[in-house]
From Swiss-Prot:
General function of this protein: Catalyzes the transfer of the diacylglyceryl group from phosphatidylglycerol to the sulfhydryl group of the N-terminal cysteine of a prolipoprotein, the first step in the formation of mature lipoproteins.
Topology relative to the membrane: Multi-pass membrane protein
Similarity remark: Belongs to the Lgt family.
Organism expressing this protein natively: Roseobacter denitrificans (strain ATCC 33942 / OCh 114)
Keyword terms: Cell inner membrane, Cell membrane, Membrane, Transferase, Transmembrane, Transmembrane helix
Name of the protein in question: Phosphatidylglycerol--prolipoprotein diacylglyceryl transferase
Pathway as given in its UniProt record: Protein modification; lipoprotein biosynthesis (diacylglyceryl transfer)
Top-level taxon of the source organism: Bacteria
Transmembrane annotation, as ranges: 19-39, 69-89, 101-121, 139-159, 195-215, 224-244, 267-287
Xref: InterPro entries: Lgt
Top-level enzyme category: transferase
Length: 294
């Protein structure tokens, strides 16, 4: 097995400065979060400023409400993403070390947890302001793919969340002892750049599909449809990529080398697949409901 693509020599930090003895660094991952949120916010604002895209030419939210909701979304992403990682992937460790649960600067965020955080934030906000929830879910879903695209690219730059070992010509030799520890492989180990697979499927393709549905097919006139396509599209994309993505180390044992979170007689699902199945089912239900209501 050989790597045909060497990992690019890039630092996770864009730059670092020292202020009063404290080192402050801007990392690609943080920049991806910031730019992704801003791009999603601008995309949503464009949609709410187009009354013709909405049922009865009435956007469900004003531009001011979108900006207000953005604060709730940011809090939901950070808290949900962190708590999702803690309880979905390493509950035992963090229950023994509760002081590290909120140490987000040490790394460890989960998309499914962040999604639950955003859903909770959106539910509370729409309840307080008496906003139609399905239409609000549509507009929130529209703003997610830019963050997914940039976030997964940042994962690649950070050389984290890499894929399983492969002999395909686009395999990448990620740095680090863990990335190069491949069972049965001598010499350099090439891995699937699964972060880029996710960036393309969940970010670029899914984002383009949602934009096409909103601006070309007036999908916002059918509440719940855009959100349904997002849930189903992300769920299917993530479920597929999990076949190529290296599972978290805590799930891998001698009797479970594939790192399956649930398995019977060698067959099973990774944690990412287990969490994606409910998304697929919810997405299908929302799409069917929206079509029936139309």
């Amino acid at each position: 097995m050989r790597a045909t693509i060497p990992f690019p020599d890039m630092s996770p930090e864009i730059f670092s400065i020292s202020v009063f003895g404290f080192d402050l660094a801007l990392r690609w991952y943080a920049l991806a979060y910031i730019v992704g949120i801003v791009l999603g916010w601008r995309l949503v604002l464009r949609a709410v400023k187009r009354p013709d895209l909405w049922r009865d030419d009435q956007p469900v939210m004003t531009a001011a409400q979108i900006e207000d909701l953005l604060t709730w979304v940011i809090v939901g992403v950070i808290l949900g993403g962190r708590l999702g990682y803690v309880f979905f992937y390493q509950p035992g460790y963090y229950l023994q070390n509760p002081s590290e649960i909120l140490a987000v600067w040490q790394g460890g965020m989960a998309f499914h947890g962040g999604l639950l955080g955003v859903i909770a934030a959106g539910f509370i906000y729409t309840w307080r302001h008496r906003i139609a929830r399905l239409s609000a879910a549509d507009i929130m879903a529209l703003g997610v793919p830019p963050g997914l695209l940039l976030g997964r690219i940042a994962n690649f730059i950070n050389a984290e969340l890499w894929g399983r070992a492969t002999d395909m010509p686009w395999g990448v030799a990620f740095p680090g002892a863990a990335a190069q520890d491949c069972a049965g492989v001598e010499g350099i180990c090439a891995r699937h750049p699964s972060q880029l697979y996710e960036a393309g499927l969940e970010g670029l393709i899914l984002g383009a599909l949602l934009i096409w549905l909103v601006w070309k097919k007036a999908a916002l006139k059918t509440p719940g449809y855009v959100a349904g396509v997002f849930f189903a599209g992300y769920g299917v994309s993530r479920f597929f990529v999990e076949f190529f993505r290296q599972p978290d180390a805590q799930f891998i044992t001698d009797g479970n080398p594939l790192g399956l979170a649930w398995h019977i007689n060698g067959w099973g699902l990774t944690m990412g697949q287990c969490l994606s199945l409910p998304m697929i089912l919810l997405g299908i239900w929302l799409i069917a409901r929206a079509r029936h209501a139309a």
